[in-house]
Amino acid sequence: MAKEKFDRSKPHLNVGTIGHVDHGKTTLTAAITTTLAKAIGGKNKAVAYDQIDNAPEEKARGITIATSHQEYETNNRHYAHVDCPGHADYVKNMITGAAQMDAAILVVSATDGPMPQTKEHILLARQVGVPYVIVFINKADMLAADERAEMIEMVEMDVRDLLNKYNFPGDTTPIVYGSAVKALEGDESEIGAPAILKLMEALDTFVPNPKRVTDKPFLMPVEDVFSITGRGTVATGRVEQGVLKVNDEVEIIGIRPTTKTVVTGIEMFRKLLDQAEAGDNIGALLRGTKKEDIERGQVLAKPGSITPHKKFAAEVYVLTKDEGGRHTPFINNYRPQFYFRTTDVTGVCNLPNGVEMVMPGDNVSLTVELISPIAMDKGLKFAIREGGRTIGSGVVVDIIE
């Protein structure tokens, strides 16, 4: 069967659920798809909870590890939705997921209020540059009707304080309360389906249409690579900037020597595209490229537009112990992992002259030398990680070599 073309008539946004484990992120994602399928119809399809929580090794532990992509639309917009992992061990995936958001829906349980991972995810959203956050206070059905208003008001105040603390506009952020479970059951009371529609309205109105960087040269970080029998190798990822047309030449840059190839096909949500633009999650079919020739962490880019580098100057913020960072300072020649776009690369830190050590909570200018080159430009953001947790975040301020 021929694949249908992807419809671009509505503005497209990438959103995702963030928040503490078991506060209801995946249930909310299911409730959004189900409620919109009923209320608006159109292309909306109800997606069940266990379809979203679908990677097999995760279900055993009842926690979402991978990021799952869903799509839905309101009357005004088309949304691609990532359900982000909530568990602390999987912050790495959160970094790959959250980096892809134009907005995040922070889910907070009405019975618990903000918890450690609520803070961690707001901080991460700030670090990886999620521009807008809106809030859904979930599990309102667990509160006695006579206590509900008072309890929710307390949780709301806590959440607004937290958002302000991490430089989001806590005072003006839309906060909607309800019950994702009730909405999934088709409940029409104010905490059921109507709460979900109210949340969607907040998403439509509070978050402006993102300004896409379509005029910059094409660049797509590679997230995954697989081969399709008889067709060739497909690289998937989110287009970071620019436009890609079928039959465009691209370079594969970073980690290994740079190579060139031609894109012979582009797909998004299993539909064929003539061209992809910034913000699209796509698969690009690459002519004559073997699966072994390309890996996660490389980028596809317009030839000549970006080069791989190992050594750069960076401005770095080192997390405090309370933010989940190191408990002790680090010294010259510290060797953590640097998380660029979709992968970790080990690098050596050189401290500025006269600086003996860097304390948690410090801002510092570092020179970093990576063990393999990464496609980079000034302004590229990264996380610094050690033993599976984020201990700092930074930005490339100058390329040295």
From Swiss-Prot:
Enzyme Commission number(s) of this protein: 3.6.5.3
Key word Calcium present: no
Subcellular location: Cytoplasm
G5, as annotated region: 179-181
Domain tr-type G span(s) in chain numbering: 10-211
InterPro entries recorded: EF-Tu_GTP-bd (IPR041709), EF-Tu_GTPase (IPR050055), EFTu-like_2 (IPR004161), EFTU_2 (IPR033720), G_TR_CS (IPR031157), P-loop_NTPase (IPR027417), Small_GTP-bd (IPR005225), T_Tr_GTP-bd_dom (IPR000795)
Pfam families (UniProt xref): GTP_EFTU, GTP_EFTU_D2, GTP_EFTU_D3
Stretch list, region G1: 19-26
Keywords, ordered alphabetically: Cytoplasm, Elongation factor, GTP-binding, Hydrolase, Magnesium, Metal-binding, Nucleotide-binding, Protein biosynthesis
Residues given in the record as Mg(2+) binding sites: T26
Region of interest (G4), ranges: 138-141
Binding sites annotated in the UniProt record for GTP: 19-26, 83-87, 138-141
MF term (GO), any: GTP binding
Region (G3): 83-86
Gene3D superfamilies, per the entry: P-loop containing nucleotide triphosphate hydrolases (3.40.50.300), Translation factors (2.40.30.10)
GO cellular component: cytosol
Catalytic reactions of this protein: GTP + H2O = GDP + phosphate + H(+)
Annotated region described as G2, given as residue ranges: 62-66
Entry similarity comment: Belongs to the TRAFAC class translation factor GTPase superfamily. Classic translation factor GTPase family. EF-Tu/EF-1A subfamily.
HAMAP family, sorted: EF_Tu_B
Function in brief: GTP hydrolase that promotes the GTP-dependent binding of aminoacyl-tRNA to the A-site of ribosomes during protein biosynthesis.
Quaternary organization: Monomer.
Protein's UniProt name: Elongation factor Tu
Species in which this protein is naturally found: Leptospira borgpetersenii serovar Hardjo-bovis (strain JB197)
Encoding gene per record: tuf
